[in-house]
Amino acid sequence: MSEKSKGIIIFASNTDKIDYLEIAARCASLVRHTLKLPVTLITDDEQYQNSVFDNIVRIAALDNTNTKYYNNTTWAWRNKSRYLAYELSPYDTTILLDADYLALTDNLLKLLDTHFDYLIVKDSYNTQEVLTQPMARGSINFLWATVVVFNKTQITKNLFELVARIENRYSYYCAMFNIFNQSYRNDYAFAIADLIINGYHLDNNKRIPWSMFTFDSDIKNMERLNESLIIRTDKNAHIIPVQDIHIMDKLYLLSDSYKNFLEEYINAA
């Protein structure tokens, strides 16, 4: 039996304010270093080229109507069509990553040789609190679709088909699950699809077995000091062990400061 192919998929579509393709390229340069896996970009940009990606798959143009609120500002957010990951992935085992996820370790590799249909992040925390919460009052907790690891099985195929159905009928599912903010979120769609797939039972066997660290404040700079990371904001400095991080500050991910951090991090090994 031939060895299963393994790789990473990143979706990225630019908006008028954020160059998500550049964020994805920086993410790819990091994961090629830490995970040493091929990386496929899925984008609706018809002309974008970058050799950091092993493969670029182009999809139909995404609408620009979805929004998110961060740092007292409403941003356009083109996060739809994630359900295409199953169909378009060229790999037997896929790590589906958001471009703002910094894989600073090789921890995700530990999941690839285990037996599973799919695994999703259940819990996330920041420097002060656990971020896991219900989608709405009286509803289920959402999952973090920031990282989804999956094998090509019938159950996984069913999951992504359900995500597609939920995206296309999002208002209906929002009403069903008591969600009042109807701005589309993959975190919600995957949580609902996961619940339905598992017979309306929560199956913790389909969870990534550790919590995700999310930094949800604006960042001034980051620095690695031996086995620690120093994350500086305008007011504070946070010292944490080296670990994977979900970064919410997209402007920092586009900054020269972050570019320099990546170059130093990659070249230090």
Predicted regions and their residues:
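Short, polar loop motifs at secondary-structure junctions
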Residues: 42-48, 61-62, 103-105, 124-125, ...
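A glycosyltransferase accessory/donor-loop signature
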Residues: 1-11, 21, 41, 51-52, ...
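Short, acidic, metal-binding catalytic loop of nucleotide-sugar glycosyltransferases
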Residues: 26, 30-37
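GT-A fold catalytic core of metal-dependent nucleotide-sugar glycosyltransferases
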Residues: 58, 78-128
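Class I SAM-dependent methyltransferase SAM-binding "motif I" and its flanking Rossmann-like core
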Residues: 120-142
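Short loop/helix-cap segments at secondary-structure boundaries that form the rim of catalytic
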Residues: 46-54, 109-114
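Active-site-proximal specificity loops/subdomain of glycosyltransferases
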Residues: 48-89
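Short, hydrophobic beta-strand segments that form beta-sheet elements in well-ordered domains
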Residues: 36-44, 95, 119-121
